């Protein structure tokens, strides 16, 4: 089966999209979904050097390894090779509107992901929880037939 990649996009690839990537990877591993991967990038990430320390703290608290993470600039090739590109806001999606595989979190999860940059750790923690809930909706929308459910043997594709 061909591997499918979900790419998460925010502005600088230091706060929201790395949290979304890490939380998504954790969720697909927990649900035993195979042949799906995650990535993240920023629309304006040219000068980004590392993940925001508060975003890192949120991932660490959730037991998510981000040690190999490095912020990167979004490139056309990444969009073209992704199964789905999910932007944190409608405005970010509008910048990429010429691609058919680009969505906003609002379209999938019912709300945008607010930017916690420069705020208290508690705001980052709340953002991480909003992302976790959105990730569940993303998986349910795009991969609902690919993970086993309790007491539902035979009701999913292998």
Q: Where on the chain are the PLM-derived regions?
A:
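Conserved active-site segments centered on acidic
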Residues: 1-80, 140-158
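Phosphate-binding/catalytic loops
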Residues: 84, 88-158
């Amino acid at each position: 089966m061909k591997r499918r990649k979900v790419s998460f996009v925010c502005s600088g690839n230091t706060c929201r999209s790395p949290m979304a990537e890490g939380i998504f990877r954790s969720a697909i591993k927990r649900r035993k979904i195979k042949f799906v991967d995650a990535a993240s990038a920023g629309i304006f990430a040219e000068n980004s050097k590392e993940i925001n320390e508060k975003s890192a703290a949120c991932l660490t608290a959730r037991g998510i390894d981000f040690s190999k993470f490095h912020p990167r600039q979004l490139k056309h090739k990444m969009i073209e090779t992704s199964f789905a590109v999910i932007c944190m806001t409608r405005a970010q999606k509008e910048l990429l509107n010429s691609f058919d595989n680009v969505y906003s979190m609002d379209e999938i999860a019912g709300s945008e992901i607010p930017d916690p940059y420069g705020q208290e750790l508690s705001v980052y923690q709340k953002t991480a929880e909003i992302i976790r809930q959105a990730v569940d909706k993303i998986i349910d929308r795009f991969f609902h037939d690919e993970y086993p459910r309790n007491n539902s043997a035979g009701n999913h594709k292998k």
